[in-house]
Swiss-Prot record:
Function field: Allows the formation of correctly charged Asn-tRNA(Asn) or Gln-tRNA(Gln) through the transamidation of misacylated Asp-tRNA(Asn) or Glu-tRNA(Gln) in organisms which lack either or both of asparaginyl-tRNA or glutaminyl-tRNA synthetases. The reaction takes place in the presence of glutamine and ATP through an activated phospho-Asp-tRNA(Asn) or phospho-Glu-tRNA(Gln).
Regions that span the bilayer: none
Keywords in alphabetical order: ATP-binding, Ligase, Nucleotide-binding, Protein biosynthesis
Gene3D superfamilies assigned: Glu-tRNAGln amidotransferase C subunit, N-terminal domain
EC number: 6.3.5.-
Example GO biological process: translation
A molecular function GO annotation: ATP binding
SUBUNIT field: Heterotrimer of A, B and C subunits.
Similarity comment: family membership: Belongs to the GatC family.
Catalytic activity reported: L-glutamyl-tRNA(Gln) + L-glutamine + ATP + H2O = L-glutaminyl-tRNA(Gln) + L-glutamate + ADP + phosphate + H(+); L-aspartyl-tRNA(Asn) + L-glutamine + ATP + H2O = L-asparaginyl-tRNA(Asn) + L-glutamate + ADP + phosphate + 2 H(+)
Coiled coil: none
Protein name, per record: Aspartyl/glutamyl-tRNA(Asn/Gln) amidotransferase subunit C
Top-level EC class: ligase
Length: 95
């Protein structure tokens, strides 16, 4: 696939980028180089490559899922205009 100056103008317009006439030819070359590289990638045989999410295999440590009260519910409820029974009291919004 080859990019012409009209395509560069259209892409610049869609990206809301102001491009001068002098910049069109260099951008055309850069876009053609990028597309040539993508075409090379499309031709690679990756049938035997396992899917991955990153280059370096990493596992994040999981912590135990424990429910707590936050260790300071009184301080949290002190920020509320009204509280009752350990909960925020809010105005009724649905009849």
């Amino acid at each position: 696939m080859s990019v012409d100056q009209a395509t560069v103008r259209r892409v610049a317009h869609l990206a809301r980028i102001a491009v001068s006439e002098e910049e069109l030819e260099p951008l055309k070359g850069e876009l053609n180089a990028i597309l040539a590289f993508v075409e090379q990638l499309a031709n690679l045989d990756v049938a035997d490559v396992e899917p991955m999410t990153g280059v370096i295999p990493m596992e994040l440590p999981m912590r135990e899922d424990v429910v707590t009260d936050g260790h300071y519910p009184e301080k949290i409820l002190a920020n509320a205009p009204e509280a009752e029974g350990g909960f925020f009291t809010v105005p009724k919004v649905v009849e």
